[in-house]
Amino acid sequence: MEGETLGTFVMVKCNTSHSEADIASRIMAIDGEMKASMSIFDETSLLSQINRNECDTLDNHLIYNIELAERFYTLSSGAYDITVKPLTDAWGFGRDESKDTPNIDSILQFVGYDRIAIEDNRLVKQDSRTQIDLNSIAKGYTVDVVGEELEALGIVDYIVNIGGEVRCRGRNAEGKLWAIGIETPYDGNMAMDSIEKIITVDNGALATSGNYRRFYINDLGEKITHTIDPRTGYSVSSTLLSATVVAPSCAEADAAATMFMALGSEGGALELAKECERTLGWKYYFIYADGEGYKIECSEEYR
């Protein structure tokens, strides 16, 4: 089945006796649950209420993702940080698309994962102005929830793709591993919507993060990308155009891909990716701008 959810496309392929309408209704129910919990674009969501300090009680979805985010905050020495929302808003990548240069120093005073804590299922903030953005992990997490729903129905062969974040189990209709295409980034000289690499994933998940679609040019002619370094408050300047990660869960792959983009080419993304492959088994496929073209750094099996 194919359709739309979470503001993007959704594609599910599986071998099952359940009707497409049944599968679709289950996905839409999950979509509604995720939006009600974690959306920063729905003003009625629980996370939006928490960001406005109207409540502090967390549901299980928020607890899981906020705790998982701490792992990536630590791995990246703070480059990945879900409290980055005030900065992304200030740079024009939130609901308010104002592109005026913000007062970074004043905002940094209340940005930082170390300024929040979970106590008795409640979010405790050191500063009431701190706000959370889970967009870097929520879509991958939703893919996992959909996959787990399919597995609860006894479905063992499936692929779930929501906006390019993918989870797959078993084999396709031909009895082969699921094949997933990695998009070629568009960066001036490159063709849009072309496939750079097709890889197979064996009972895992894949996510890609990139800076080649969401950016703008400010009044000074500077390229401002949507990836903001929460440690400096400024847009990440990097030759790393996209980072694809294969991991056991899509939430992990989603957060890891964002983490590597936040670190960038100068911040040790490649070195950390190699370490994560060695210690955690994650695979990576990085595409860098390189003069008139691009270059690839990736796990050995993708070469």
Descriptions of predicted regions:
Residues 1-303:
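Mature catalytic core of soluble alpha/beta enzymes
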